[in-house]
Regions:
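Alpha-helical elements of Rossmann-like donor-binding domains used by nucleotide-donor carbohydrate transfer enzymes
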Residues: 19, 23, 38, 52, ...
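Active-site neighborhood of HAD-like aspartate-dependent phosphohydrolases
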Residues: 1-37, 41, 45, 59-63, ...
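Short, charge-rich amphipathic alpha-helical segments embedded
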Residues: 64-68
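Asp-based, Mg2+/Mn2+-dependent phosphohydrolase catalytic module
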Residues: 2, 106-183
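Short beta-strand segments
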Residues: 5-7, 14, 100-104, 159
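Hydrophobic alpha-helical core bundles mediating ligand binding, dimerization, or RNAP-core interactions
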Residues: 20-21, 53-57, 72-75, 109, ...
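Short, acidic loop-to-helix structural element flanking the phosphoryl-transfer center
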Residues: 69-100, 138
Length: 183
């Protein structure tokens, strides 16, 4: 194995639940499903805006748009590195592995996460909002493999969604389904 590819949300970064208000935890309950809702997937794809997503969530929840916008801002601001994964990234880099990011992520989230020092340890990235394709669609994996000249059989994907690992395996790569409960 030469290349290790990390997902971001739920693998390298997460909201510390002890810092989240009950409202925030309840607000994002729609994300705790095997597949993301279509409106959120389009947000990650970069084909819908923060304003559109905020309006959709407002309509779903009956909460004012301003409240939904504030909760979304808080959701971004509370992202922080998952300490065991952050240490693993550092250890793998020190051991000479090539490290990459492959993540479904909106512009607001990725711009915030790129500010963390651990992000500088990666050799490359493919982020859904910049490529207009999302996992588990094969194209986003192909972009990563082609852009960085990665051989699938030498590449390990770490993701918190089984369907994304299955998509990597379909291209000949290896995968580990990650769980924050095991950190």
């Amino acid at each position: 194995m030469k290349n290790i590819v990390f997902d971001l949300g739920g693998v390298l970064f997460a909201r510390d639940k002890s810092k989240c208000t009950p409202e925030l935890l309840e607000f994002f309950s729609f994300l705790r499903t095997p597949r993301m809702p279509l409106f959120w997937e389009e947000y990650d794809r970069g084909t819908s805006t923060l304003e559109e997503v905020t309006a959709t969530i407002s309509g779903m929840t009956g909460r004012p748009v301003e409240t939904c916008a504030a909760v979304l801002r808080l959701a971004v601001d509370l992202q922080e590195p998952v300490k065991p994964t952050e240490r693993l990234v550092g250890d793998l880099k020190a051991a000479g592995y090539r490290l990459y990011v492959l993540s479904n992520m909106s512009r607001e989230f990725i711009d915030f996460l790129r500010r963390f020092p651990v992000y500088g340890l990666f050799d490359g990235e493919v982020v859904s909002c910049e490529e207009h394709t999302v996992k588990p669609e094969p194209r986003i994996y192909e972009i990563l493999l082609e852009r960085y000249g990665l051989t699938p059989s030498e590449t390990l994907f770490i993701d918190d969604r089984e369907m994304n690992i299955e998509a990597a395996a379909a291209l000949g790569a290896y995968g580990i389904t990650f769980s924050l409960h095991n950190t």
